[in-house]
Amino acid sequence: MKTITFFKRVLASAALVSVCGFACATNNGKQFIHNDTMEGGKLVCREIYAMNDAASGILNPVKMYKYSYDTDQQKTVKSTYAWNIFKNTWETESRTVISRYETETSVEYSVWNKEKGSFDLSKKYIYITDNNNQLIAQYAYK
């Protein structure tokens, strides 16, 4: 019985290693480079570029993240943009809004709706902690 359990673990480990190998191989040799914009010691914008061919040195925009902070210097909004190669412009993709109250933190994830021109709330998570910042309850809404 112990031998069967051992072989199951070995098989699961081998499967995990091969999945990781396939995931690494899917980038097709692309290198990703990021450009960070800092203000007051805080990251406010990160642009991600792909370098398909290191010899040419040509960078292609992929994603951009913009961050907002509250007066306590805690992150409140993360906006995600994707590069549209046909329009040569950044297009809104999603937004994450973090709201903090005394012992409650709310995280709302919204996806951009092109037809409406606004965000559609996709997921909402609420985390409740005690005075020692230990998690008491977690709620998820879709």
Model-found features: residue ranges?
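Bacterial Sec-dependent N-terminal signal peptides
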Residues: 1-31
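Buried hydrophobic residues that stabilize the cores of well-folded domains
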Residues: 24-142
